[in-house]
């Protein structure tokens, strides 16, 4: 590495640290740590074990954020010192390069920590795909997205399960529900919520005309035991049915599939992945809790935006991304303007660039 390149990297790293400092509010962070530490010394702190564990985890996260930032500051100062010494002792260059690599790795990890800092970013995720109007073409597009997200999840090391699968009449799917289990699953996948638009020559059109199709994607965090969602038994209607996998695989001879309808809201969820009716009901209840909680959060967001006079529409139906197969190839996110030409790679699950751009855009928007 040339000295000029080293000097440039040191400048860029300092700029990143300055940006992190602005977004962190270190004084506020210290105050919050002190408050939580005082709270943990109270005599009745461990009376509510679940709440105590949550507070303890929150404190550990804040401490880690604070300490890591100061470690990076020290490492940054160290690289500057090495640079000054390099003019008199070239043998120190290797140590300088090692310190730079170490700092850049920590900076990259830290940036992702800041980007995934919203309340449920670390939770598992539930993702639903529903084709819009357009028959077989739209249902095939939904199936393509199903494949894309499955490949993405597997590449990330998530445990991906198909909770419910409704096959299309001729091809594709009518709906599918997936669960993604792993660190930051919801934090990564929340960027995918909205309507996805496809433009291509339809393989189902004998005239080979260009078609535009739409599919909606819903993403919810799977809630843990610290979040309570009150659901009355009287408000739930349960139906059972014979369940089977994609394409009619492993069809059960008994009714193990469970469909729950929340009567007050009309929300419907279903699970077919488990071999028992009890297991599927448990999974369906988790999905229903997540949907009802998400609905409540949307209502609160709408109230806040009404007070602010925010004109932005907060709906599942806002078009977020276009996938163009013809007359050229391009995938473009309409929120961040991030785009790539390699549509095949995107359909193979390579959506990290879109997720990264969304998280940075969202952090700036907040």
Swiss-Prot record:
Single GO molecular function: translation release factor activity, codon specific
Alphabetized SUPFAM superfamilies for the sequence: Release factor (SSF75620)
Main location class: cytoplasm
InterPro entries: PCRF (IPR005139), Pep_chain_release_fac_I (IPR000352), Pep_chain_release_fac_I_sf (IPR045853), PrfB (IPR004374)
Keywords noted in UniProt: Cytoplasm, Methylation, Protein biosynthesis
Post-translational modification (record): Methylated by PrmC. Methylation increases the termination efficiency of RF2.
Localization annotation: Cytoplasm
Function field: Peptide chain release factor 2 directs the termination of translation in response to the peptide chain termination codons UGA and UAA.
Protein family (similarity comment): Belongs to the prokaryotic/mitochondrial release factor family.
Protein name in the entry: Peptide chain release factor 2
Gene that encodes the chain: prfB
């Amino acid at each position: 590495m040339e000295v000029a390149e080293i000097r440039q990297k040191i400048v860029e790293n300092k700029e990143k640290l300055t940006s992190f400092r602005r977004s962190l509010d270190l004084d506020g962070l210290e105050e919050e740590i002190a408050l939580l530490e005082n709270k943990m010394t109270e005599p009745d702190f461990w009376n509510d074990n679940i709440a105590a564990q949550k507070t303890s985890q929150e404190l550990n996260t804040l401490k880690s954020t604070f300490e890591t930032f100061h470690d990076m500051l020290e490492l940054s100062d160290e690289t500057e010192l090495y640079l000054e010494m390099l003019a008199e002792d070239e043998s120190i260059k290797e140590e300088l390069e090692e310190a730079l690599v170490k700092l850049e790795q920590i900076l990259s990890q830290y940036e992702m920590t800041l980007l995934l800092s919203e309340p449920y970013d670390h939770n598992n995720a539930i993702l639903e795909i529903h084709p819009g109007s357009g028959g077989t073409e739209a249902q095939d597009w939904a199936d393509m997205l199903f494949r894309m997200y499955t490949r993405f999840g597997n590449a990330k090391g998530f445990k991906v399960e198909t909770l419910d699968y409704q096959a299309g009449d001729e091809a594709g799917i009518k709906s599918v529900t997936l669960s993604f289990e792993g660190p930051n699953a919801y934090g990564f996948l929340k960027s995918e919520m909205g309507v996805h638009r496809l433009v291509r020559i339809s393989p189902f059109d004998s005239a080979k005309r260009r078609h535009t199709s739409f599919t909606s994607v819903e993403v919810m965090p799977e809630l843990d035991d610290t979040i309570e969602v009150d659901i009355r038994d009287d408000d739930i209607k349960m139906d059972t049915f014979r369940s089977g996998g994609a394409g009619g695989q492993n069809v059960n001879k008994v009714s193990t599939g469970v469909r729950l309808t929340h009567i007050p809201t009309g929300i419907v969820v279903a699970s077919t992945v488990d071999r028992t009716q009890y297991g599927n009901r448990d999974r369906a209840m988790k999905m229903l809790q997540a949907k009802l909680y998400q609905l409540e959060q949307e209502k609160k967001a709408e109230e806040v935006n009404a007070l602010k006079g925010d004109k932005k529409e907060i709906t599942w139906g806002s078009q977020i991304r276009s996938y163009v197969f013809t007359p050229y190839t391009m995938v473009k996110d309409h929120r961040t303007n991030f785009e790539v030409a390699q549509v095949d790679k995107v359909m193979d699950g390579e959506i990290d660039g879109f997720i990264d751009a969304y998280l940075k855009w969202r952090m700036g928007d907040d």
